[in-house]
Structure formats: C-alpha cells, structure tokens
C-alpha cells in the first residue's frame, strides 16, 4: 500500500500529506474490503460457533482492511506505573495522525458539514471522508440489540488497549447513565462473555 501511495504522490494523483494519503489509501482498501452484508453474515455464522470466533474474525478484518493501522499503533507508548493504589496502565496514543498545515488550510475553506453527525454515527460506514473527517470506506460495523434498542459494534481505530471496541446507538443521541444503560451493558456481556464493557459518564 505504501508503494501505491508513493506512486500516486509522484504522479500527482494524491497530495503528499498524512491526511491526503489516508484519504487515498482508505479509498483503495474500501474497494477490496468485503461488503457490509458479507461481513455481518460471516460474523453471525461464526457467532453460532462461539462469540469469540466471531470477534476474532472481525478484529482481524478491521486490521487487515487497514481500518486499524497496525504500523502506527506499534509506535504508541505504554507502560505500567506502580502506585500506592495499585498498578496503573499508562498509554500515550501516537497513532492518531496530526493535522498538517495544508489540510488545516483546506478545511478552513470548506463549507461546514454535519454529515456524519459525529465520528461514531453509523453513517461513517463507507463514508468517503474529507480533510476534516476521516475516510471510512474500509469500515464495517456489526448490528446488535441491547435493551430492546438497535446498537452497533466497532473497533476503535486507535486501540487504547487490546481489542478496544466501541458500542454505539443506531441513532445519534446523547450519552446517558441511567437504569437502562446498565441493562444494556449487561445485555452486551451476555452476548460477548469474553469481553468486559463500561460506559463514559453523561456526555453531550
């Protein structure tokens, strides 16, 4: 993929910056990543064997499609600090690309956009991206029902810890901690007993 990117840059097909290279290589990977329906079908089929088989497949796909950029993740800094309260895992995430000056200038000239509404909305799946919103043509999400509501599972592209996944509502709604939130967390554990799950505090 790096060779293709270098060729694209040298032949004027892509600007030479992290943002534009990411947009370009994600478009390429989107063409060879299996369709969402195929990914969901394979996931569900493997889930019948075991939930872990299903998530193993999905996590590997998320890496092989370059949605999770392994070559960047390996640069993250991680260590354990001993404290009087116990060991604390500390991570410094270096895999999230920094904006370059060209991309910042281009973003300032763009009309404001509200699609997708945020980086987690289901509409990100397959989204072509722009200089101020990452491309997601290689992104696939897994539907599930929690507490009677439609949710999706995805892995974080920035991997703060092993198999770092995110569960999000099918609708763009504020996060809320209440009884139903705990019911949904427990539903998730029943579906994926090899994982643990938590929830952020109430956030807008």
Give, region by region, the residue ranges found by the protein language model.
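Active-site microenvironments that recognize anionic phosphate/pyrophosphate groups
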Residues: 1-174
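Short C-terminal domain-edge/linker segments immediately following a structured domain
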Residues: 119-125, 183-185, 198-199
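Short acidic (Asp/Glu) patches
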Residues: 135-138, 182, 200-201
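A broadly tuned preference for mixed-charge, low-complexity surface segments
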Residues: 146, 203-204
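Helical scaffold of the NTase/Pol beta-like nucleotidyltransferase catalytic core
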Residues: 170-195
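A short glycine-rich, hydrophobically flanked beta-strand micro-motif that places a catalytic Asp/Glu
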Residues: 195-203
């Amino acid at each position: 993929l790096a060779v293709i990117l270098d060729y694209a840059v040298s032949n004027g097909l892509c600007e030479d910056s992290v943002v534009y290279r990411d947009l370009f290589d994600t478009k390429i990977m989107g063409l060879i990543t299996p369709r969402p329906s195929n990914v969901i079908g394979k996931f569900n089929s493997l889930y019948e064997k075991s939930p872990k088989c299903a998530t193993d497949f999905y996590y590997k796909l998320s890496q092989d499609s370059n949605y999770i950029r392994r070559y960047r993740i390996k640069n993250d800094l991680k260590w354990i600090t001993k404290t009087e309260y116990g060991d604390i895992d500390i991570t410094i995430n270096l895999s999230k690309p920094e904006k370059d000056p060209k991309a910042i200038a281009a973003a300032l000239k763009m009309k404001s956009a509200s699609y997708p509404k945020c980086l987690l909305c289901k509409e990100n799946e397959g989204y072509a991206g722009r200089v101020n919103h990452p491309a997601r043509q290689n992104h696939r999400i897994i539907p599930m029902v929690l507490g009677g509501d439609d949710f999706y599972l995805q892995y974080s592209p920035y991997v703060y810890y092993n198999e770092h996944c995110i569960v999000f509502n099918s609708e763009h709604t504020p996060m809320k901690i209440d009884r139903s939130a705990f019911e949904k967390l427990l539903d998730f554990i029943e579906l994926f007993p090899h994982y643990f799950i938590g929830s952020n505090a109430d956030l807008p």
